[in-house]
Amino acid sequence: GLIQTLPQTVNGEGSIVVQNPHATAIFGKLIVQFAESSEPMAIRYFYIPAKQSLELFRTPSGRFQIQILTLDKPIAYVSPIFTVPLYSTNRVIQKADWAFPHAPETVF
């Protein structure tokens, strides 16, 4: 049978760019699930001023979700889940204009 590959849980070669299109600053967290059998966990927290971008370097492999909170009127938004493959050197760009608002206390 196939032997499960261990995830790259330390610094990878790829990066994730988070673009903030909002007219307000955002606070956010980068959540990763390294493997099907592991619990998702926050590995980075960040702050991005209005209309700015931030590049998170040396991201590991796994399934990711970005969760943000707008800071003028607190509303939470979450990205679709996306995957960074093992040994990826790619830059993933995520524009934080996701459609479905969440109550802040359910996300943060």
For the regions a protein language model found, what residue spans apply to each?
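Short, solvent-exposed loop/turn segments in extracellular or other extracytoplasmic domains
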Residues: Y47-S53
